[in-house]
């Protein structure tokens, strides 16, 4: 630290310690103060007295907190008012010294004239007498001074010169757990300079550079060097509450921090027992808690209001933005890793919160930086830089954190599975009029189509009815029916073998449900975090994943809930299962691992489904990401209308790849190994990055970005022009196919013919009986029919053609021709035998009856002849029994016997699965006398976060009671949950659909089967350990009981 800051300087006049009767904002310490906020109860009582009837409940709390104190209206805090006036004067003077540009904003704000420069009349503005004096004190030295004025100015300058700004050269002594890095010390000095000049600011360092630590260091400086311990408020996302609290205790333990979180009763107790007594310096709370307890927080004069992830207030009309603007604050600080996500108006919203007296008009700001009229103006860019320079500090990892390895992103392009293509086609066909620009293009309709297509790209099981069942099983079909899951199933074993640990992000929590089933099936230990995860469980999962030598391999997170403020630097691989519309959200997700403390190169794998809407979404996000860096790093301006996705652009996204999907119904998934997939993805990623860099160079030179052209121009085609002639284009839907029955051998015989001309069919007698193989005529009949056909060919002089496809074509032709030449006609006995044999088959069984018989065998199993007979319509049980006996005896005579047997065996496997599940449930339930109260489930390390054990117990016991194999059992189970008083207020369980209950029960059954198997193996091991039992004869000789239960007397 510099010499000027070695002894802690005395507090300046504006932050002098206040008397005990002063407001909380004083933050000073004296003989009656213990270092925390003082006068909290007195001020709260006074505020409650003036609040009115609406605050009656809060008045009671205040009365409890300060018994015996008389309610009286407290006078405005003179220290607070003095600090605000001094800061305002210092702020204007500081800004005008930075650049005269701020006179444009400051003078209109002081004069209260029309805010838009277009409405201001030319000429010298009129200034009121009292306002003129204020402006003169700000920096107008051109008028003639009196001697008294000059003396006052010299005294003021002298007093300012004695207050040297504190500047640290090394990590402050009050920072205990470690030392600040060089760039963090510079950031702390910048924050201190803002405070000294009465300026609020934005700390916009890239995610992972320690904005939390720099903020805590600033609050520590306020306490140790300015004697202002608080009260300070830190407003953070719910997911980062615990992290902020632990960071306070770790880095600056002398700061007393408290956390407001909980239900209504817990919050009331916190306000009464913790907040009002004032034994604290910093209050950390979430956005939601702030909104609920705004009436309490408004009663404080906050010294510092810090908002983490400040883009939450980018919309000045949101409820959170309006509430925080109502608070009394001396200083404000915004923290964000993404200072500009969309447009300049959002930047104005942040600046207006920081300095409302400077940036008081959005119209003025928008006119001053008119992106429509001034694009390409170099002076305008310089003007923007000058405006941002005093308020905003942004560093990126590549510039300041040399020890942090750069992250490497690879886009992995995957194909659609057969099921995905069917669902994708179905979604497009439902709105084919939109694709061909014939229907009404409603924006909500287009957004819904986009959402459905994105669900299809992730996994078809996200649609109700897509997953095969019941019963629902967790096995290979979970992987093979999604292209992304196929790649994931190849990638994870490779990463585990390399010793990596993985974060998987997805937009959809139901995708996390599928991934959870997959991890349980593959025995990957995992953690999960989404928007429904309770606060305590969130932190438990983070701690379990980050602890040394943790066995957790996968951490699955929803992008919105798990992408903010969480430190998961113990992972080195990030998998983006799907991409967000806003690329900043994906960047935040990546930086959960790519942050200070990371020692490995972070690899990011972004899954993109090829030739689908996902390609367009990622391309648009890449464009938006480049535009985001323009204002902050490169100085270019973003058109405000650019980031609004229009109907035409959405339509182009939907149309992209539609023709390709319609062209085939087969799967695009290949057996390519993971190394080949990664190599191909890296190559394609490099090509896309090169294309984007070339696309932006001309715009960078001219400080423009023709983003409309950039979005619509792709692969050399202007999609705006294509939209104009959309009516001439037509995406042809797939042809409807007529279903037909084919003989398998004839099909393959025709399909295998390549280019040779078809040989003429061998002639048959004109009156040939229609004989089907499933009618099981006697084999002798087929011999007689063959003899009759050969003789007919002989009579017409038929010559067998040579078949070039056969290996011994000449020999085969000779043998077949010899049969014809030696053929004889049927004699009278053979004709009579033929007629008799034609009556011995199952002539009354047609193809429909045969198909019903096969399906019944598949449904009930070959041994359940009673139920099979009921399934075959128009046949008596005796007829079915007779046919079944012949079928299983002579089934090998059928042409497609392999296909039929596979169908029946699949059905029998399902039956056996149902039996094994029923047996497992019977075994589990049988261990308890009162299973609805006593049953315990062995979750192991993979307990889900959504369902409680009480809910799981009820599901299993009620499923067993209703009957697992009963039809519509899950609909009945859902009704039982709704009727049960036990779950009267369990809205989560009561809102589950039948399919969601099936999936949960399937997971529980898997756990029960695993538990039963482990118990059986344990019992076998114990029996083996005890050794074989003694033989019966030996026991009887030793006096063992006989068959009647008595011991035989031994004769001596």
Curated annotation (Swiss-Prot):
It is found in: Nucleus; Chromosome. Residues 16-55 have a biased composition (Low complexity). Coiled coil: none annotated. Residues 1-83, 1015-1052 are annotated as: Disordered. The modification N6-acetyllysine is found at residue 440. Its EC number is 3.6.4.-. It is an enzyme of class 3 (hydrolase). One of its GO terms (cellular component) is CERF complex. Residues 1-15 have a biased composition (Pro residues). Ubiquitously expressed. Residues 1023-1034 have a biased composition (Basic residues). The modification Phosphothreonine is found at residue 113. Residues 487-638 form the Helicase C-terminal domain. Residues 69-83, 1035-1044 have a biased composition (Basic and acidic residues). Residues 192-357 form the Helicase ATP-binding domain. There is a cross-link at residues 83, 644, 647, 694, 722, 735, 966 (Glycyl lysine isopeptide (Lys-Gly) (interchain with G-Cter in SUMO2)). It catalyses: ATP + H2O = ADP + phosphate + H(+). The modification Phosphoserine is found at residues 66, 116, 137, 171, 755, 825. GO terms for molecular function: ATP binding; ATP hydrolysis activity; ATP-dependent chromatin remodeler activity; chromatin binding; DNA binding; helicase activity; histone octamer slider activity; nucleosome array spacer activity. GO terms for biological process: antiviral innate immune response; cellular response to leukemia inhibitory factor; chromatin organization; chromatin remodeling; DNA damage response; DNA methylation-dependent constitutive heterochromatin formation; DNA repair; DNA-templated transcription initiation. ATP binds at residues 205-212. Residues 840-892, 943-1007 form the SANT domain. Keywords: Acetylation, Chromatin regulator, Chromosome, Host-virus interaction, Hydrolase, Isopeptide bond, Nucleus, Phosphoprotein, Repeat, Ubl conjugation. ATPase that possesses intrinsic ATP-dependent nucleosome-remodeling activity. Catalytic subunit of ISWI chromatin-remodeling complexes, which form ordered nucleosome arrays on chromatin and facilitate access to DNA during DNA-templated processes such as DNA replication, transcription, and repair; this may require intact histone H4 tails. Within the ISWI chromatin-remodeling complexes, slides edge- and center-positioned histone octamers away from their original location on the DNA template. Belongs to the SNF2/RAD54 helicase family. ISWI subfamily. This is SWI/SNF-related matrix-associated actin-dependent regulator of chromatin subfamily A member 5. It comes from Homo sapiens. The lineage of its organism: Eukaryota, Metazoa, Chordata, Craniata, Vertebrata.
